[in-house]
From Swiss-Prot:
Comp. bias (Basic and acidic residues): 237-247
Comp. bias intervals (Polar residues): 271-303, 318-357, 376-386
UniProt name for this protein: Splicing regulator SDE2
Keywords for the protein's UniProt record, in alphabetical order: Cell cycle, Cell division, Coiled coil, Cytoplasm, DNA replication, DNA-binding, Mitosis, mRNA processing, mRNA splicing, Nucleus, Ribosome biogenesis, RNA-binding
Signal sequence, renumbered to the chain: none
Domain SAP: 399-433
Domain notes: The PIP-box (PCNA interacting peptide) motif mediates both the interaction with PCNA and cleavage of the SDE2 precursor by a deubiquitinating enzyme. The SAP domain is necessary for specific binding to DNA.
Cellular localisation: Nucleus; Cytoplasm
A GO BP annotation: DNA replication
GO cellular component: cytoplasm; nucleus
GO MF entry, a single one: snoRNA binding
Amino acid sequence: MASVWVRDALSGRLQLVRVAPGAVALDLLYQEGTAIPLTDFYVKCNGHLADLEEKLQDGHTYSIEPRLCGGKGGFGSMLRALGAQIEKTTNREACRDLSGRRLRDVNHEKAMAEWTKKQADREAEKEQRRLERLQRKLAEPKHYFTDPEYHKQCHDMSERLEEAVIKGLQASSSDVVSAESDDTRKRKKDMYASKGTSSKKKCFWTGLEGLEASSSSDSSSDSDLDESPCSSSSGSKHHEYIKERLGSPESSSSSDGLEEASSAGSHQMLKGQTSGSESDNILEGPSSSAGSLHVPQLQSSSKGTEHIQEPQTCPAESEQNTETPNISDGSEENPTTVTNSECKSVTSAANTGQNEQILDDGHKFASPTLLEPKSELQQSSNTEPSSIDLVAYKTVAELEALGLEKLKLELVALGLKCGGTLQERAARLFSVRGLARDQIDPSLFAKPAKAKKK
């Protein structure tokens, strides 16, 4: 009989077992006597797996161990792949420490502890930044201009400042001059109207016809009319003045008629029929050196009536003025006495100088027809031609030097619009320089005046 040492599979106790000669390893499993199937155990001899049909040897140690149910396999390759990745990466947060906690959680806890410890420092720094921001807002802003374009514009503006001031002064001075001239003209008209109402009876002298026109009458009469307003005279003063004016032998017959009329002391006016348009001709005063007689100019109308006007003369010493009646050749020769209420004052056009006395060359007086007062704009537009040569002016600036009033007269003489500033008037007049009337832009012409409703 042989003796072998057997280790229990469940308890792990080692005990001595006597077996019959010729017994095999399988017999040890039968001696176990458990309900577990024999297929779930195997026998090991001295640490080596023994075949179940192997004979038992005396004195050897046999262990009965249960079988472990393993997987289906294939995990080796997976482990080898993970091992390679673990060697390559530096992120160990997915690993665990010896206590079984993941390194990710451990590191997060450490970071939270440090952040909480520095919370007070962060609050203090935030408050410091807030105070600094408030101080910056309370402080006065400092402007730094480093734009080269800005500096260039400032430099150019300072250079053009003097030129702009000079142009502004020129424009303002021209406006002031025009305003003063308008005020002076209005004062003259007011003074003329006041004198006309309070003066003596006005008379219109006729009967001087056939007198020769003076060659230099236009310029002197214009200057006389511009210098002082005129009013009608009567009585002996008028008689003496007419005698002095008509003292030459050429007008002896006319002066006789005038003397008779003035000595009678009546202001005689003869009403005549005038079928043609009124045309005013200027009779200028006597020159200072020769004292020669200035004769009126004759101009025939379309129906054969002749209108003669004698210029108004304004002697400063006697303040005597004459009016401008119209005379027709075919009128009756009977003089008619006119009262002061029937005499109408005729306004003088200072710019044109065309209100004249009309005389017939006969000894007797024809009945006059009172002239209707004309506005300054109508007289200047109908009678005064353009007095400047536009071709002589090369730039608009040269035309601006003429002033607002002169430019207005030139534009009215051409029938153009006369409104606007000094620069606009000069530019408008310069645009028609050297052009015929049919070549001028129609938009530049002034619109015809509308007839006033009666």
